[in-house]
């Protein structure tokens, strides 16, 4: 493991830079280009959802296995694999000529984020055991900056070069290759992010037994449920709040952008600050406080049409969302031994993807009822309340596998 403070700082800086370019690249590949590109290929309307969701499937399928393998073979090899996918996938879009080949490329591209994020977080958690909340939060804020810049940069390139998509995906590729070069130069040096924790006689059965320990740990299950609910709600708000602001409130697109953007900015700025606080006071209080605040803020959206209040609610929700996320990842790796740090992060990432995938789908069904936006946002508040109950009950029953 990286030893000196100087090397630790260098590693952390490189991981943030790697995360920025990697997520910038992957987000540019879909926002705002994916829908017009898919439409230009003659994709039927009923298949657009398949193309859009193809990249989320790997997150559900392989985050846990990939992160578990990083526990066994070390983080370096797994991170290099993810960086290679980030670099190679963008250029495959240049050969796409049908909706199904686009879906396949999206599926392949999804492996990059599914592998990279949990393994990177596991590496940071190991290297900064007393500053996990702060460091993981800063890393995630760096990736969030890349995610926030992508639509603007991608939109500008698309505006200048439309109707051609060649230049756009070349730009996506440049960002991906930059991430790969950063990873290759740094990770190729003779420094090990994490030694393999399993003995030489490792077998698949031992990895599966580790997974069994995770799902038997009440604390892990409680935190994972909270994470799933947080992204279920976030995915739903991200999609349906725009509709509420335009259809019900009657705001123009620019005003909508200010409200949605302020939520993201609040998330980016506040998350590291709350992460530092959680390192000092513990994880439980920020998680519960953040969920309670989210419950009231989300539930209040359909009761106002005033721009200043909607802006305040959006900023408040961004802060409360950041408050919860700043503590979930650090807490989950503190409940497991060193052999399962990666696996615990992978399990958390899997639950996150499940929540973010199901959120818009189930919320869409609720929205289709006569209650529409009122029923939708109320259902999100109820689910947040349920997550508090589950978390508090699991907090009482949890046991630390380190003591077993």
What positions do the PLM features span?
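Helix-loop boundary and gating motifs at the non-cytosolic
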Residues: 8-49, 56, 222, 231-245
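Symmetry-related core transmembrane helices of the 12-TM Major Facilitator Superfamily/SLC fold
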Residues: 168-184, 376-392
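Structural signature of the two symmetry-related core transmembrane helices
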Residues: 77-91, 285-300
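Helix-breaking motifs and short loop linkers at transmembrane-helix boundaries and internal kinks
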Residues: 74, 95-100, 129, 162, ...
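Paired small-residue
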Residues: 100-108, 308-316
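Juxtamembrane intracellular "pre-TM" segments in multi-pass secondary transporters
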Residues: 1-9, 191-222
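Residue-level signature of mid-helix packing/kink "hotspots" within the transmembrane helices
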Residues: 56-64, 147-148, 264-272, 356-357
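Cytoplasmic helix-loop-helix junction between adjacent transmembrane helices
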Residues: 105-144, 331
């Amino acid at each position: 493991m990286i030893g000196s403070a100087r090397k630790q700082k260098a590693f952390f800086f490189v991981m943030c830079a790697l995360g920025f370019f990697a997520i910038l690249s992957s987000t540019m590949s879909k926002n705002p280009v994916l829908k017009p590109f898919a439409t230009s290929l003659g994709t039927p309307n009923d298949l657009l959802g398949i193309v859009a969701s193809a990249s989320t499937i790997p997150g559900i399928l392989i985050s846990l296995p990939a992160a578990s393998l990083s526990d066994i073979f070390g983080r370096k090899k797994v991170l290099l694999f993810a960086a290679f996918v980030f670099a190679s996938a963008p250029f495959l879009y240049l050969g796409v000529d049908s909706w199904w080949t686009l879906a396949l490329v999206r599926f392949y591209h999804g492996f990059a984020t599914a592998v990279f994020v949990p393994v990177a977080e596991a590496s940071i958690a190991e290297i900064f055991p007393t500053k996990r909340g702060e460091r993981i939060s800063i890393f995630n804020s760096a990736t969030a900056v890349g995610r926030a810049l992508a639509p603007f940069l991608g939109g500008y390139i698309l505006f200048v070069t439309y109707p051609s998509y060649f230049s756009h995906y070349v730009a996506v590729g440049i960002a991906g290759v930059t991430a790969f070069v950063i990873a290759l130069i740094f990770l190729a040096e003779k420094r090990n992010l994490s030694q393999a924790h399993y003995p030489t006689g490792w077998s698949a059965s031992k990895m599966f037994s580790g997974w069994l320990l995770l799902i038997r740990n009440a604390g892990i299950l409680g935190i994972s449920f909270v994470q799933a609910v947080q992204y279920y709600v976030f995915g739903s708000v991200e999609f349906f709040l725009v509709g509420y602001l335009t259809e019900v409130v009657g705001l123009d697109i620019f005003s909508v952008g200010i409200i949605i953007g302020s939520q993201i900015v609040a998330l980016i700025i506040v998350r590291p600050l709350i992460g530092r606080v959680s390192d000092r006071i513990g994880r439980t209080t920020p998680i519960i406080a953040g969920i309670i605040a989210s419950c009231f803020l989300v539930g209040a959206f359909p009761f106002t049409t005033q721009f200043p209040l909607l802006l305040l609610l959006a900023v408040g929700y961004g802060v409360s969302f950041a408050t919860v996320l700043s503590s979930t990842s650090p807490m989950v790796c503190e409940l497991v031994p060193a052999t399962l740090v990666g696996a615990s992060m992978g399990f958390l990432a899997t639950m996150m993807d499940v929540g973010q995938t199901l959120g818009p789908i189930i919320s869409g069904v609720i929205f289709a009822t006569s209650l529409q936006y009122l029923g939708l946002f109320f259902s999100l508040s109820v689910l947040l309340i349920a997550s508090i109950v589950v978390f508090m009950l699991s907090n009482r029953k949890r046991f630390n596998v380190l003591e077993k």
